[in-house]
Amino acid sequence: AAGLFQFPRV
């Protein structure tokens, strides 16, 4: 699931 990790989790 690359589309899930295109934004950083901070």
Curated annotation (Swiss-Prot):
Keywords: Amidation, Neuropeptide, Secreted. The modification Valine amide is found at V10. One of its GO terms (cellular component) is extracellular region. One of its GO terms (molecular function) is neuropeptide hormone activity. The keyword Cell cycle does not apply. Found in the abdominal ganglia and perisympathetic organs. Not detected in the thoracic ganglia, subesophageal ganglion, corpora cardiaca, corpora allata, hypocerebral ganglion or frontal ganglion. It comes from the Eukaryota. GO terms for biological process: neuropeptide signaling pathway. It is found in: Secreted. Belongs to the periviscerokinin family. Myotropic peptide; increases the frequency of contraction of the heart and stimulates amplitude and tonus of the foregut. This is Periviscerokinin-1.
